[in-house]
Protein backbone atom coordinates (compact mmCIF):
# COMPACT_ATOMS: atom_id res chain seq x y z
CA UNK A 1 0.00 0.00 0.00
CA UNK A 2 2.75 2.46 0.97
CA UNK A 3 4.77 1.60 -2.13
CA UNK A 4 1.75 2.18 -4.34
CA UNK A 5 1.09 5.57 -2.78
CA UNK A 6 4.76 6.56 -2.91
CA UNK A 7 4.95 5.73 -6.61
CA UNK A 8 1.73 7.61 -7.37
CA UNK A 9 2.86 10.74 -5.54
CA UNK A 10 6.38 10.51 -6.95
CA UNK A 11 5.27 10.20 -10.58
CA UNK A 12 2.56 12.85 -10.23
CA UNK A 13 4.90 15.34 -8.55
CA UNK A 14 7.64 14.74 -11.12
CA UNK A 15 5.29 15.31 -14.05
CA UNK A 16 3.75 18.36 -12.39
CA UNK A 17 7.13 20.08 -12.12
CA UNK A 18 8.16 18.96 -15.61
CA UNK A 19 4.99 20.58 -16.92
CA UNK A 20 5.49 23.80 -14.97
CA UNK A 21 9.20 24.23 -15.67
CA UNK A 22 9.26 22.70 -19.15
CA UNK A 23 6.39 24.84 -20.46
CA UNK A 24 8.06 27.90 -18.96
CA UNK A 25 11.31 27.13 -20.76
CA UNK A 26 9.51 26.44 -24.04
CA UNK A 27 7.63 29.74 -23.76
CA UNK A 28 10.85 31.57 -22.92
CA UNK A 29 12.49 30.09 -26.02
CA UNK A 30 9.64 31.12 -28.31
CA UNK A 31 8.87 34.67 -27.20
CA UNK A 32 10.11 37.61 -25.15
CA UNK A 33 6.58 38.79 -24.36
CA UNK A 34 6.09 38.18 -20.63
CA UNK A 35 2.30 38.00 -20.92
CA UNK A 36 2.51 35.35 -23.65
CA UNK A 37 5.06 33.38 -21.60
CA UNK A 38 2.80 33.45 -18.55
CA UNK A 39 -0.25 32.49 -20.61
CA UNK A 40 1.54 29.49 -22.13
CA UNK A 41 2.81 28.42 -18.72
CA UNK A 42 -0.66 28.84 -17.24
CA UNK A 43 -2.46 26.75 -19.86
CA UNK A 44 0.07 23.91 -19.66
CA UNK A 45 -0.06 23.83 -15.87
CA UNK A 46 -3.85 23.91 -15.69
CA UNK A 47 -4.22 21.16 -18.29
CA UNK A 48 -1.51 19.07 -16.66
CA UNK A 49 -3.04 19.34 -13.22
CA UNK A 50 -6.44 18.20 -14.48
CA UNK A 51 -5.01 15.12 -16.17
CA UNK A 52 -2.61 14.20 -13.35
CA UNK A 53 -5.22 14.48 -10.59
CA UNK A 54 -7.74 12.44 -12.57
CA UNK A 55 -5.14 9.79 -13.38
CA UNK A 56 -3.62 9.36 -9.93
CA UNK A 57 -6.50 10.15 -7.55
CA UNK A 58 -7.41 6.48 -7.16
CA UNK A 59 -3.79 5.50 -6.49
CA UNK A 60 -2.70 7.98 -3.83
CA UNK A 61 -5.30 10.73 -3.68
CA UNK A 62 -3.13 12.88 -5.97
CA UNK A 63 -1.87 15.33 -3.37
CA UNK A 64 1.47 16.23 -5.04
CA UNK A 65 1.79 18.83 -2.30
CA UNK A 66 3.04 18.65 1.33
CA UNK A 67 0.56 21.38 2.34
CA UNK A 68 -2.33 19.25 1.06
CA UNK A 69 -0.95 16.15 2.78
CA UNK A 70 -0.62 18.06 6.06
CA UNK A 71 -4.25 19.17 5.97
CA UNK A 72 -5.41 15.70 4.91
CA UNK A 73 -3.70 14.31 8.02
CA UNK A 74 -5.25 16.88 10.35
CA UNK A 75 -8.69 16.11 8.94
CA UNK A 76 -8.08 12.35 9.35
CA UNK A 77 -8.07 11.62 5.61
CA UNK A 78 -4.70 9.87 5.86
CA UNK A 79 -2.92 8.11 8.72
CA UNK A 80 0.15 9.44 10.51
CA UNK A 81 2.41 6.66 9.22
CA UNK A 82 1.77 7.79 5.62
CA UNK A 83 2.95 11.39 6.07
CA UNK A 84 6.63 10.63 5.49
CA UNK A 85 5.78 8.42 2.51
CA UNK A 86 3.76 11.16 0.86
CA UNK A 87 6.03 14.12 1.56
CA UNK A 88 9.25 12.31 0.65
CA UNK A 89 7.68 11.14 -2.63
CA UNK A 90 6.50 14.67 -3.39
CA UNK A 91 9.87 16.30 -2.72
CA UNK A 92 11.89 13.66 -4.56
CA UNK A 93 9.44 13.66 -7.47
CA UNK A 94 9.55 17.44 -7.78
CA UNK A 95 13.36 17.44 -7.71
CA UNK A 96 13.49 14.78 -10.43
CA UNK A 97 10.94 16.76 -12.42
CA UNK A 98 12.99 19.95 -12.45
CA UNK A 99 16.14 18.07 -13.44
CA UNK A 100 14.37 16.31 -16.31
CA UNK A 101 12.81 19.57 -17.52
CA UNK A 102 16.23 21.25 -17.51
CA UNK A 103 17.77 18.26 -19.30
CA UNK A 104 15.11 18.17 -22.03
CA UNK A 105 16.02 21.75 -22.97
CA UNK A 106 19.78 21.16 -22.83
CA UNK A 107 20.28 23.11 -19.61
CA UNK A 108 22.31 22.05 -16.56
CA UNK A 109 20.45 19.42 -14.53
CA UNK A 110 20.64 21.70 -11.50
CA UNK A 111 21.13 25.45 -11.76
CA UNK A 112 20.28 27.80 -8.91
CA UNK A 113 17.72 30.37 -9.97
CA UNK A 114 18.63 34.05 -9.93
CA UNK A 115 14.98 35.09 -10.23
CA UNK A 116 14.25 37.18 -7.14
CA UNK A 117 10.66 37.25 -5.90
CA UNK A 118 10.81 39.46 -2.78
CA UNK A 119 8.29 41.46 -0.77
CA UNK A 120 5.68 41.11 1.95
CA UNK A 121 2.99 41.56 -0.69
CA UNK A 122 4.23 38.39 -2.41
CA UNK A 123 4.30 36.57 0.94
CA UNK A 124 0.63 37.47 1.43
CA UNK A 125 -0.17 36.51 -2.16
CA UNK A 126 1.32 33.06 -1.63
CA UNK A 127 -0.56 32.68 1.65
CA UNK A 128 -3.81 33.57 -0.12
CA UNK A 129 -3.05 31.24 -3.03
CA UNK A 130 -2.50 28.26 -0.73
CA UNK A 131 -5.49 29.09 1.45
CA UNK A 132 -7.69 29.13 -1.65
CA UNK A 133 -6.27 25.88 -2.98
CA UNK A 134 -6.92 23.95 0.24
CA UNK A 135 -10.36 25.48 0.67
CA UNK A 136 -11.36 24.55 -2.89
CA UNK A 137 -10.07 20.98 -2.54
CA UNK A 138 -12.19 20.38 0.55
CA UNK A 139 -15.15 22.18 -0.95
CA UNK A 140 -15.23 19.71 -3.85
CA UNK A 141 -13.79 16.56 -2.24
CA UNK A 142 -17.14 14.82 -1.78
CA UNK A 143 -18.08 15.41 -5.42
CA UNK A 144 -15.37 13.07 -6.71
CA UNK A 145 -11.92 13.24 -8.25
CA UNK A 146 -13.08 14.78 -11.54
CA UNK A 147 -14.68 17.67 -9.69
CA UNK A 148 -11.54 18.16 -7.57
CA UNK A 149 -9.32 17.97 -10.66
CA UNK A 150 -11.37 20.53 -12.56
CA UNK A 151 -11.60 22.86 -9.57
CA UNK A 152 -7.89 22.70 -8.73
CA UNK A 153 -6.83 23.09 -12.36
CA UNK A 154 -9.04 26.11 -12.98
CA UNK A 155 -8.15 27.70 -9.63
CA UNK A 156 -4.41 27.43 -10.26
CA UNK A 157 -4.96 28.74 -13.80
CA UNK A 158 -6.64 31.79 -12.27
CA UNK A 159 -4.04 31.99 -9.50
CA UNK A 160 -1.21 32.45 -12.00
CA UNK A 161 -2.90 35.73 -12.93
CA UNK A 162 -4.59 37.13 -9.83
CA UNK A 163 -1.70 36.64 -7.38
CA UNK A 164 1.58 38.56 -7.52
CA UNK A 165 3.40 35.35 -6.56
CA UNK A 166 1.92 33.47 -9.56
CA UNK A 167 0.43 30.97 -7.12
CA UNK A 168 3.05 28.32 -6.35
CA UNK A 169 0.85 27.10 -3.44
CA UNK A 170 3.10 24.06 -2.94
CA UNK A 171 6.25 23.80 -0.76
CA UNK A 172 7.73 20.91 -2.76
CA UNK A 173 7.25 22.75 -6.05
CA UNK A 174 8.72 25.94 -4.56
CA UNK A 175 11.80 24.02 -3.45
CA UNK A 176 12.23 22.35 -6.85
CA UNK A 177 11.88 25.62 -8.76
CA UNK A 178 14.92 26.91 -6.89
CA UNK A 179 16.98 24.63 -9.15
CA UNK A 180 16.09 26.08 -12.54
CA UNK A 181 17.39 29.45 -13.69
CA UNK A 182 14.54 29.89 -16.14
CA UNK A 183 11.14 31.60 -16.41
CA UNK A 184 9.56 29.63 -13.55
CA UNK A 185 12.56 29.70 -11.22
CA UNK A 186 12.78 31.29 -7.78
CA UNK A 187 15.88 32.42 -5.91
CA UNK A 188 16.85 30.30 -2.92
CA UNK A 189 16.76 33.56 -0.94
CA UNK A 190 12.98 33.75 -1.43
CA UNK A 191 12.07 30.06 -1.25
CA UNK A 192 11.85 29.92 2.59
CA UNK A 193 9.35 32.81 2.73
CA UNK A 194 7.21 31.14 0.06
CA UNK A 195 7.18 27.88 2.00
CA UNK A 196 6.31 29.61 5.29
CA UNK A 197 3.48 31.51 3.58
CA UNK A 198 2.16 28.28 2.07
CA UNK A 199 2.14 26.50 5.43
CA UNK A 200 0.38 29.42 7.13
CA UNK A 201 -2.17 29.58 4.31
CA UNK A 202 -2.85 25.85 4.60
CA UNK A 203 -3.29 26.05 8.38
CA UNK A 204 -5.67 29.01 8.08
CA UNK A 205 -7.68 27.07 5.51
CA UNK A 206 -7.74 24.07 7.86
CA UNK A 207 -9.15 26.28 10.63
CA UNK A 208 -11.94 27.60 8.38
CA UNK A 209 -12.66 24.19 6.86
CA UNK A 210 -13.23 22.67 10.29
CA UNK A 211 -15.73 25.44 11.05
CA UNK A 212 -17.84 25.35 7.91
CA UNK A 213 -17.16 22.19 5.86
CA UNK A 214 -17.81 18.63 7.01
CA UNK A 215 -14.57 16.63 6.81
CA UNK A 216 -16.09 13.26 7.79
Locations of the language-model features?
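Membrane-interface helix-loop junctions and terminal tails of multi-pass membrane proteins
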Residues: 1-216
Amino acid sequence: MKNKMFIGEFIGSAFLVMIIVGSGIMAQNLTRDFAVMLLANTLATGAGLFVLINSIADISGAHFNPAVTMVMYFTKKIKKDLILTYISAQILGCLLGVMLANFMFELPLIELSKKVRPGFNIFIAELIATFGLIFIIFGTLKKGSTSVAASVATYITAGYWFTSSTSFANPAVALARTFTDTFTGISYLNTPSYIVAEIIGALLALFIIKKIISTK
